[in-house]
Amino acid sequence: MVRKFKTMDGNTAAAHVSYAFTEVAGIYPITPSSPMAEKVDEWSAKGRKNLFGSTVDVIQMQSEAGAAGTCHGSLQAGALTTTFTSSQGLMLMIPAMYAMGGQFLPSVMHIASRVVTSNHHSIFGDHTDFMTCRMTGYAMLMSSCPQEAMDLGAVAHLSAISGRYAFMHCFDGFRTSHETVSYTHLRAHETSLHLV
């Protein structure tokens, strides 16, 4: 098998693999995770098909709390659901995360981690946002480069589906999220269909 390489940043890599395994995406943009939601919204608008042969239903809400509520509701209805967030936005999702984690719903959150601070203008990379959520019932995966953002993103989705468990897939905001590198391209549609 010939290995194919592409050049992409961490946000796009996570969005690419997420799109393949998602039926509903509840979104609200927040830096540095906004490009993930924007890519999924763009691909959905262009009619791109996911692994299941349908277009992802993207629902933009009024806040991160609304996006988490959308995820909770659609997961209860049986749809594979994803969201993308960071920092203070993740803090607003915690109440819904306890519900989703406690109900063993196969949620996946892709988090471009950023410092949680009273000064919302800080762009420093930090893990306080997702570490605050460690007791919500979500399993945690951490990627350190764009290649891992794609690979562990797929692991998060496949594990959530097979184990009926909620996952946070985290990586450093502004470092991994915006780092552009060449990596081995995972063709989720071709390599993962037999795993679902």
Residue spans for each PLM region:
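Flexible, glycine/proline-enriched loop segments at strand-loop-helix junctions
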Residues: 136-148, 165
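Conserved small/polar residues in nucleotide/adenosyl-binding loops
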Residues: 184-191
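Alpha-helix N-cap recognition
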Residues: 63, 144-148, 152, 191
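Thiamine diphosphate
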Residues: 1-132, 137, 154, 173-174
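A contiguous loop/helix-start segment that scaffolds small-molecule binding in enzyme catalytic cores
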Residues: 180
